[in-house]
């Protein structure tokens, strides 16, 4: 690129993007300035400056750049999505949420990234139901759908403290494409909570009525499954001990 003849906008943009990739911020700033010297209305230069500001974690500068780009291209959602991210990272979560909502509801191409942004913002604010609703926006045809299901499962497991919530979380970890070790860990957590809740009438979990003994059996199985999958010797020993502690013993 340094040997390219002239300094056309295309060459300068390519130089700027290459500088961004290699964290060469001064070179990027030079490319941006040359672009703006040639054309003060070159929105691509301002966009590039916004990307650089994000990389430098200068979120107010990123917001200013992306807001300026949106002002020049009011019908485009890309600068609005970028502005939402800059606001999110800069702590302006209310504005970020509003921008993500607009992106998610305006163009199908932006639903997935906007939905994940909404989920992050709402999770940060402690709005678990709102975060789950955002993740549910991700279409089944999207490449991000499996990730959305994993995120839903993780949030449901973390929040599950009563019988209906534990039941819903168990269904979610079955439906999501999770690694076996993650399924085992989540199952352990959920059956530990279920064991504390189950009474004489049993407990309804994922479409089944389980007795206290059956819950203990499921918990023991989760301990042993997780023990078989972990590479950590100390953790494996603790899990096996926990499984043995709840196994029903009989004298022959």
Which residues fall in each region the model found?
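Regulatory extensions appended to serine/threonine kinase catalytic cores
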Residues: 1-15
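"A position-specific structural signal for the A-helix of alpha-solenoid helical repeats
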Residues: 14, 48, 82, 117, ...
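Start-of-helix register in tetratricopeptide repeats
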Residues: 10, 44, 78, 112-113, ...
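Structural marker of alpha-solenoid helical repeat scaffolds
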Residues: 38, 72, 106-107, 140-141, ...
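Eukaryotic alpha-helical solenoid repeat scaffolds
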Residues: 1-3, 130, 136-252
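Structural motif corresponding to the intra-repeat A-B loop/turn of tetratricopeptide repeats
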Residues: 22, 56, 90, 125, ...
